[in-house]
């Protein structure tokens, strides 16, 4: 069970974008892509077959999953824990103890 999932609101805790918030767009193997964070400029060649023009595009690149933390109701970074209730695993915030939706 992943502690951070698609759609979670996270805050960057280290790196050049420290303190910025965003929504997780996708989760990969040890990496997350967060909307509007870790933007880099990529040069793109024009391709008339696909109908794309060339130029410089801003692209969102993945971040290490350890460099982001979930945002709690108070707007602060919080670690995530997993507890077992019966036969189900439930994520919860360690700062407030609030359970997160499945």
Swiss-Prot record:
Identify a single GO molecular function assigned to this protein. rRNA binding
The record's InterPro entries line, in alphabetical order, gives: KOW, Rib_uL2_dom2, Ribosomal_uL24, Ribosomal_uL24_CS, Ribosomal_uL24_KOW, Translation_prot_SH3-like_sf
Any GO BP annotation: translation
* One of the record's GO cellular component terms: ribonucleoprotein complex
Summary of subunit composition and partner proteins? Part of the 50S ribosomal subunit.
Q: What does this protein do?
A: One of two assembly initiator proteins, it binds directly to the 5'-end of the 23S rRNA, where it nucleates assembly of the 50S subunit.
- Tell me which HAMAP family the record gives: Ribosomal_uL24_B (MF_01326_B)
Protein name in the entry: Large ribosomal subunit protein uL24
Q: Which gene encodes it?
A: rplX
């Amino acid at each position: 069970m992943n502690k951070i999932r698609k759609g979670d609101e996270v805050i960057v805790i280290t790196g050049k974008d420290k303190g910025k918030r965003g929504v997780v767009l996708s989760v990969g193997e040890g990496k997350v892509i967060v909307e509007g964070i870790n933007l880099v400029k990529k040069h793109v060649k024009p391709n008339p077959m696909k109908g794309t023009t060339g130029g410089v595009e801003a692209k969102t690149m993945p971040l290490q999953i350890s460099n982001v933390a979930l945002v709690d109701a108070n707007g602060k970074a919080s670690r995530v824990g997993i507890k077992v209730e019966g036969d189900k695993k439930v994520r919860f915030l360690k700062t407030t103890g609030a359970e997160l939706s499945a």
